[in-house]
């Protein structure tokens, strides 16, 4: 059973209606995932194509600063899912380019949904300056076991779950051990403790920065590896959506979760 948790992307004054109304302009209800596109190209796509064909939103790749490491003389997609900081410096572009994309897409009625990576940071053993290892921005980092130092966001070893589980999730844990699924490392990725108030502050602060820019919603990566109570505490700190982004007349609060449970190949989401 695969469980995926996504921010509800809905605005409504009634919680039981939160799963029916996507924050899009002009009743558009289709989302396109422009995976690994550059911000400048997404902005142009909103203006030249998406607005004319009924698309309501674009889901973009994680915009935060990330690991930079080649594999087979190429840059693999998974480096985007190993954050270094919450600075808006990624292989998709700069902070200014991200802001410009959000503004231009919103202007033509296409909303932006951000893929947020908050379960973890880089893989254990990754350190900037080691052979072939860098970051997409200017932040230093040291993911060595027991060091776990990410000054670009302020995290150190005290902000990770090593004290709960000092190792990886095992395959069998997914059948019978929620504690290990949520507290141990996912394929070696340094697992953040979302129960720590400093971690909650940094994650919610970054999400609020994106809301201020004009983002309309979030996909939360690796949600099943985080405790629901911790996620609720983080998302409970979020601001209202900007009034020019929300289409609600009396409440533009971003609702918490939408849950999908599937037992077959994932083919689509219905919002």
Which role does the model predict for each range below?
Residues 1-4:
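Classical eukaryotic N-terminal signal peptides for Sec-dependent ER targeting/secretion
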Residues 7-11, 16-30, 44-51, 55, ...:
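Active-site-proximal helices and loops of the catalytic beta/alpha 8
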Residues 15-39, 186-196:
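Boundary/entry segment of secreted carbohydrate-active catalytic domains
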Residues 26-29, 66-103, 140-193:
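Aromatic- and acidic-residue-enriched carbohydrate-binding clefts of CAZyme catalytic domains
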Residues 34-36, 88-90, 222:
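Short glycine-centered, acidic/aromatic-flanked micro-motifs in structured strand/loop junctions
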Residues 34-39, 52, 63, 108, ...:
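N-terminal pro-sequences and low-complexity stem/linker regions of secreted or lumenal proteins
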């Amino acid at each position: 059973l695969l469980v995926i948790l996504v921010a509800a992307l809905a605005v409504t004054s009634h919680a039981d209606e939160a799963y029916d109304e996507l924050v899009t302009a002009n009743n558009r209800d289709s989302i396109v995932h422009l995976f690994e596109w550059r911000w400048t190209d997404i902005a142009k796509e909103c203006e030249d194509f998406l607005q004319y064909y009924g698309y309501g939103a674009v889901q973009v790749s994680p915009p935060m600063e990330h690991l930079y490491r080649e594999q087979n003389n190429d840059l693999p997609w998974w480096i985007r899912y190993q954050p270094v900081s919450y600075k808006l410096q990624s292989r998709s572009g700069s902070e200014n380019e991200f802001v410009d994309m959000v503004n231009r897409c919103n202007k033509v009625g296409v909303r932006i949904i951000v893929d947020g990576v908050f379960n973890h940071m880089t893989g254990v053993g990754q350190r900037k300056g080691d052979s072939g290892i860098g970051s997409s921005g200017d932040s230093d980092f040291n993911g060595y076991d027991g060091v776990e130092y990410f000054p670009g966001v302020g995290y150190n070893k005290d902000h990770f779950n090593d004290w709960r589980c000092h190792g990886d999730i095992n395959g069998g844990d997914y059948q019978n051990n929620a504690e290990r699924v949520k507290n141990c490392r996912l394929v070696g990725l340094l697992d953040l403790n979302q129960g720590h108030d400093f971690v909650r502050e940094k994650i919610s602060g970054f999400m609020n920065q994106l809301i201020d820019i004009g983002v309309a919603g979030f996909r939360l990566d690796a949600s099943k590896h985080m405790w629901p109570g911790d996620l609720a505490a983080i998302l409970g700190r979020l601001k209202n959506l900007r009034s020019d982004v929300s289409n609600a007349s009396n409440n533009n609060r971003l609702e918490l979760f939408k849950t999908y449970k599937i037992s077959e190949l994932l083919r689509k989401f219905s919002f």
